[in-house]
């Protein structure tokens, strides 16, 4: 694990972040030289430009070269709609700002997120790259090679949108105001400085990770879980997961206690709901629905609860001075910190932790093996990595199957050719919006055997396969001499050296201390949508195990 960074080291960290126009790397990984610029848009550099008849660089690296010596085909992304439907869409566009189709498209997509991509891919003939309308026209990528290119490309090729949104999914304006968290910032809107501040905040608290994790788990197991044991019908699996992660995140980054469970649960749900489309009517409908949703769930009151805790943290002034030193605006810094802690942290880890608990309720043999492996000794953040092979494999399969975000959007900054696992290239034009449907990309049968099945032992049998998992948004970049992971917009929590070990300690301690059964069966086997299980799934049986520690 990386050494702890003192606050006094933050200026050096920022200088390193701002003076390099390279991909961000996890703190725990060694630095490596960057590849020289590619001469062919859409083909990562370092290797020579392919000769006629050769596979694209990415295809050769992954073993997905075209059959024989055929030259890679350069294709236009297929449409998922028939010509008749596209003609009707064109005619409807004449109505301009009152065209109802963008509103219909975005509502249909937002209520059936990943399945809409699956249906559209089938309608487009099963190709890995296709065009569709989800309130905005997008090019959707759905296989491993295209996602690897998408995640690993520099911002000169692909950059975030210039707005606080993920495609049509906008952040409610009242939740951020002038703040621009790195999760929604492009290079044009200050992503480099923001990410430097995000990582610096985490590094300044790195030496407190283990103690914060120990204290937060003790509080939850001693004070919160007895209530769950007595009244399991009053808590969902997500409630319990959010409580564990929320207790840790607020203790670690703010040295305080979290808001109520209701406030923890409500913030991520009501954050990304401001639907935005390509015309006035669709955006108006989406914004109106956002305001109604927030009013119905009392979001303003619940969010104010968390915001008050942020403002009264003893570390708030430290972070404000840190932001000033780095040249980052301190306007709405409280909202920025709340987004970092509650959305990136609590929702980002909490949702997927709930999925792991649900999976293990179905895979009892895996649960038994994990219990034998981890034993009864307390798990520590600084020693859990590399000590438990099955737990490690389970963690990578967890990331492959469930890790968010499920969709990532970027804008093409130039004309590109996107490689795919079948060796073909797909044209994307400058300014087109690309959406990576990551659950589909992580279930590419050319990379993973039985990709739609959750297999906790997958990486025991083939440890090198770990490098093909998009680990917190990171991808394998090169071998020099060991594999190195990189990502322009990868998770800052992972960059700070925290993400994977945090999950292992949380789920490892859970299986040591808890016996449980769920009130329903979860259909994760064969599920390629990346869903985290029914949001209201509960425990039918839950009780403490012995011995405790």
Swiss-Prot record:
Pathway(s) per entry: Lipid metabolism; oxylipin biosynthesis
Pfam families for the chain: p450
GO BP annotations, alphabetical order: fatty acid biosynthetic process; oxylipin biosynthetic process; sterol metabolic process
Biased composition (Low complexity): 27-41
Subcellular locations according to the entry: Mitochondrion
Chemical reaction(s) catalysed: (13S)-hydroperoxy-(9Z,11E,15Z)-octadecatrienoate = plasmodiophorol A; (13S)-hydroperoxy-(9Z,11E,15Z)-octadecatrienoate = plasmodiophorol B
A cellular component term, taken from the record's GO annotations: mitochondrion
Cofactor(s) required, per the database record: heme
Predominant location: mitochondrion
Annotated Basic and acidic residues bias: 8-26
Top-rank EC class of the record's enzyme: lyase
Region of interest: Disordered: 1-75, 528-549
One GO MF term attached to the UniProt entry: monooxygenase activity
Entry EC number(s): 4.2.1.-
Residues noted as binding heme in the record, renumbered to the chain: 491
Swiss-Prot/TrEMBL keywords: Fatty acid biosynthesis, Fatty acid metabolism, Iron, Lipid biosynthesis, Lipid metabolism, Lyase, Metal-binding, Mitochondrion, Oxylipin biosynthesis
Function: Cytochrome P450 hydroperoxide bicyclase involved in the metabolism of oxylipins natural products such as egregiachlorides, hybridalactone, ecklonialactones and related bicyclic oxylipins. Isomerizes the hydroperoxides into epoxyalcohols via epoxyallylic radical.
Entries under PANTHER family matching the protein: ALLENE OXIDE SYNTHASE, CHLOROPLASTIC (PTHR24286:SF255), CYTOCHROME P450 26 (PTHR24286)
Family in the record: Belongs to the cytochrome P450 family.
Protein name, as recorded: Mitochondrial hydroperoxide bicyclase CYP50918A1
The species this protein was found in: Plasmodiophora brassicae
